[in-house]
UniProtKB/Swiss-Prot annotation:
Cellular compartments per GO CC: plasma membrane
Keyword Cell membrane: yes
Reactions catalysed, as given in the entry: K(+)(in) + H(+)(in) = K(+)(out) + H(+)(out)
Gene (UniProt): kup
Protein name in UniProt: Probable potassium transport system protein Kup
């Protein structure tokens, strides 16, 4: 095996796994630190936000309302997280990888060609856009709710909550470029202590008021809906805050595998969350004034400051998981053709999944700070939280229907009964959250809408661009047929021409012949393709075909979670009999200047957006890791 092939094999090891096989305990601890940060910090604000609705009219909260909300929270955790995600959706892995885009690719693969694939793609894009909208809110509400614990211990610190939260958030984003390998080692133990402590505090409160366990019955949720009707429906919009982060269980399967995530949820996280929520309920039944901040008032006075510090650490971990997820999602969107090329920096020599995307990091920092300074408290931010989460739930359910029907062979009746129930439940949560739009729910919708416009405009623009290239290009077969009779001067060396379509002559080659009137003695037509799976298999990755003497067609395939590295992969061609030294070849690129045509084929606002993104896209040389001193760029003006 060549050095290049060995490096390629090393980069294809499962993400997040070191060279040695990690033990089950290590993987379980890792899952605690990465997967459950968001849902694990929900007790800081979810239960309080739900109960506050019953105080809006000045009335006193009664036992039924406490029991009803607890019942809703518990059964949401059971039905949405445990049944839907852990038992069902996590079965639909794409070669071990999860997440909305992996599920979209899987659904498109088993769907019939045509409009169905298009709409499945749109569903996946909507889910991805909502994920980014959620990613802006999660760090803001999590860090704010943790720092607000200072008010309980030191009331004089109230005016410092906002500055402290802002400093924590800025510091979190400013260290992203260094990666998370060092911090990641302590994430698991910190979250293990977090879940142990919040579960223990909840248990102690339950022991003082054991009747609160009656709320385990779903009957109390039903009674609340019957008695309060519209108000109970509104409360659902806050109850869903208890299950934010459920999507992470599925999205992070590629890092840890399904089994450690399921074990961590069933053995540690679900029991700890249940105990803490019911402990908060017991405390409020004992003292209604505890509603000011039931999570921190559950903690003994002497432990509150350490608990604030631990909560801040836990919310930073939750935010870090969301930020890392946004980086990974952005890379997948680029690879799948939904966003322009971005700078992707690897922050670890051993773990492929640890990346840093500067553009995404800056956008998230600006968005999170804007939310913190605008909404100012976690209670206010709770109104903006939930729409993106429930929208993602709906998108996941729609895509799962196709996978379970087509790939797993479920009967139409089984799919309708099982996923019809969850579609109804998710729709109730989503509809309830839509009522939050005037209070702040518009935030994730606006963010998601902007991203949706960007993704669809970029995808449509690239299709138009490819169509225009095909119109103006020469079929490769015709070019090769004329090559032996041509009087083109051949010069020493190897030239690599990148082309989006392997059956047509690259525009850069035609421009090179037009202006320089020479052709290298060895020519490679290189096409890079992205597969609908996380990683390309050894038999898929590299394809070589000799079209004529010293003229080759090379196709390199990457999975949507892989980062392209063309020089490395070209070195592997030597094992296929192609004498190529990647650092001694010339790479020819067509640097297109895209302009509006006389009769644009897309709306002007979409065209403007596409042109802006195209001009700000990372150069192909940087994206494909090609040394700039080996590149020849030839300008091409392309009207669309």
């Amino acid at each position: 095996m060549s050095a290049a092939e060995k490096l390629a094999a090393d980069e294809k090891k499962p993400i997040g796994q070191p060279t040695g096989q990690p033990t089950g305990l290590v993987m379980l601890l890792g899952a605690l630190g990465v997967v459950f940060g968001d849902i694990g910090t929900s007790p800081l604000y979810a239960f309080k936000a739900a109960l506050l609705h019953f105080q809006d009219d000045g009335s006193v909260i009664n036992r039924l309302e406490v029991y009803g909300v607890l019942s809703m929270v518990f059964w949401s955790l059971v039905l949405i997280v445990t049944v839907k995600y852990v038992l069902l959706v996590m079965r639909a892995d794409n070669q071990g990888e999860g997440g909305i885009l992996s599920l979209m690719a899987l659904a498109q693969r088993v769907a019939n060609p045509g409009r169905m694939r298009y709409w499945l793609g749109m569903t996946g894009i909507i889910g991805a856009c909502l994920f980014f909208g959620d990613g802006v809110i999660t760090p803001a509400i999590s860090v704010l709710s943790a720092v607000e614990g200072l008010e309980i211990t030191y009331p004089a610190m109230k005016d410092y909550v906002l500055p402290i939260a802002s400093v924590v958030i800025v510091a979190l984003f400013m260290v992203q470029w260094r990666g998370t390998s060092i911090m990641g080692r302590v994430f698991g133990p910190i979250m293990a202590v977090w879940f142990l402590l919040i579960g223990l505090l909840g248990l102690l409160a339950i022991l003082h008021h054991p009747k609160v366990l009656l709320a385990l019955s779903p009957g109390y949720a039903g009674l609340l809906l019957i008695q309060h009707r519209l108000l109970a429906f509104i409360v659902l919009g806050s109850v869903v805050l208890a299950v934010t982060g459920a999507e992470a269980l599925y999205a992070d399967m590629g890092h840890f595998g399904g089994r450690p995530i399921k074990q961590a949820w069933l053995w540690i996280v679900l029991p700890a969350l249940t105990l803490n929520y019911f402990g908060q309920g017991a405390l409020i039944l004992h003292d209604i004034k505890a509603l000011d901040n039931p999570f921190f008032l559950l903690t003994p006075h002497w432990l509150r400051l350490p608990m604030v510090l631990l909560a801040t650490a836990a919310t930073v971990i939750a935010s870090q998981a969301m930020i890392s997820g946004a980086f990974s999602m952005a890379r997948q969107c680029v690879q799948l053709g939904f966003l322009p090329r971005m700078t992707v920096r690897h922050t670890s020599e051993t773990e492929q999944g640890q990346i840093y995307v500067p553009q995404v990091n800056s956008a998230l920092l600006i968005g999170v700070l804007a939310l913190v300074l605008t909404f100012r408290t976690s209670d206010n931010l709770a109104a903006a939280y939930g729409i993106a989460v429930t929208g993602t739930f709906l998108c996941t359910g729609i895509l799962a229907v196709v996978v379970f029907r087509r790939q797993f062979g479920w009967s139409r009746r089984s799919v309708m009964v099982v996923f019809g129930f969850f579609f109804l439940l998710d729709s109730l949560f989503f509809a309830s959250n839509m009522l939050k739009i005037p209070q702040g729910g518009y935030v994730p919708l606006v963010l998601g809408g902007l991203l949706m416009a960007m993704m669809t405009s970029w995808s449509a623009g690239r299709r138009l661009l490819m169509s225009r290239w095909r119109q103006d290009s020469l079929p490769l077969a015709s070019f090769l047929a004329r090559l032996p009779q041509s009087r083109i001067l051949r010069v020493p060396g190897t030239a690599v021409f990148l082309t989006g379509n392997p059956d047509y002559v690259p525009g850069a080659l035609l421009h090179n012949l037009k202006h320089n009137k020479v052709l290298h003695e060895r020519v490679l037509f290189l096409t890079v393709k992205t597969l609908d799976q996380p990683e390309a298999g050894p038999d898929q990755h590299l394809e070589v075909e000799e079209l004529a003497e010293n003229v080759y067609r090379v196709i390199i395939r990457y999975g949507f979670k892989e980062s392209p590295n063309i020089p490395r992969d070209l070195d592997a061609l030597r094992a296929r009999g192609v004498p190529v030294e990647s650092m001694q070849v010339s790479y020819f690129f067509g640097r297109e200047t895209i302009v509006a045509g006389k009769a644009p084929k897309m709306p002007l606002w979409r065209l403007w957006l596409f042109l802006v993104m195209a001009r700000n896209a990372v150069p192909a040389t940087e994206f494909f890791r090609i040394p700039s001193d080996r590149v020849v760029e030839l300008g091409v003006r392309v009207p669309i």
